[in-house]
Amino acid sequence: MANQDQAYLDLLKKIMTEGNDKNDRTGTGTRSLFGAQMRFDLSQGFPILTTKRVPFGLIKSELLWFLRGDTNIRFLLEHKNHIWDEWAFKNWVTSPEYQGPDMTDFGLRSQKDPGFKAVYDEEMQKFCQRILDDEAFAQKYGNLGDVYGAQWRHWGKRDGGFIDQIADVIEQIKTNPDSRRLIVTAWNPEDVPSSALPPCHVLFQFYVADGKLSLQLYQRSGDMFLGVPFNIASYSLLLSLIARETGLEVGEFVHTIGDAHIYKNHFAQVEEQLKRKPFDAPTLWLNPGKKKVADFEMADIKLVNYQHGSTIKAPVAV
């Protein structure tokens, strides 16, 4: 297997040396490039970074959550995935029912005030446990609305119906593989003004040639150190699952990013990662008894021979 880190590492270097220093909504500041692109040939191994540990279990559970059309964090919490907790927690602490400590600007305050962080961590733990234990509470406060799962599988129509974009694109790949309309979108202009965080992964398109299925993602904004490593592995897994259902071999994952940026408080971590030597890419194992995307569960997806460097911690810009 080949080293699959190189395209990512090369882009990190290019941003650090050629990028534009910009302000951003978090106040942290970034160095960014516009219109970056990376290409990964999945026949050369599964493209999950090896120069630091990337938690594949979180990637699996999040993608399966999207593909279920689920928008409630309860499924994620059942699989010990806390990626989306803060969005649901915000709904709870800003509701009239919440009577606990003041949680205004909890994301920023929890990073800057150790005393507040202890209070925040306790409230978050209680919230997550209540989501797991209380179905009615989970239905009311665990639902995130029109996030990726809803847009992919239940895109609302003007007539009151919905479009299942994933089912539609799978059928089109099978019946009309040369189509240039093999597209799934998550960007709904009507929802953007009211969204806490409008979709970063705006659109992806499939391409069939020589019995291989490829996928290109257009991502409007990419946090290169923390977010993009997840995105690379997640969409490579999505490509692999849909290739399985459509009876095709895996081709390329092409990752196009509008604003590819490194936060200024991640510069030291990036320099550390760039010093590390990559390992060969692991192999993705999919249960040979499963074919349909909808049938896959956590145990049906594994990485074989995933060697990696240690975790490199970095603060989240909020």
From Swiss-Prot:
It comes from the Bacteria. GO terms for cellular component: cytosol. The keyword NADP does not apply. Pathway: Pyrimidine metabolism; dTTP biosynthesis. The keyword Cytoplasm applies. It is found in: Cytoplasm. It is an enzyme of class 2 (transferase). One of its GO terms (molecular function) is thymidylate synthase activity. Its main location: cytoplasm. Catalyzes the reductive methylation of 2'-deoxyuridine-5'-monophosphate (dUMP) to 2'-deoxythymidine-5'-monophosphate (dTMP) while utilizing 5,10-methylenetetrahydrofolate (mTHF) as the methyl donor and reductant in the reaction, yielding dihydrofolate (DHF) as a by-product. This enzymatic reaction provides an intracellular de novo source of dTMP, an essential precursor for DNA biosynthesis. Homodimer. This is Thymidylate synthase.
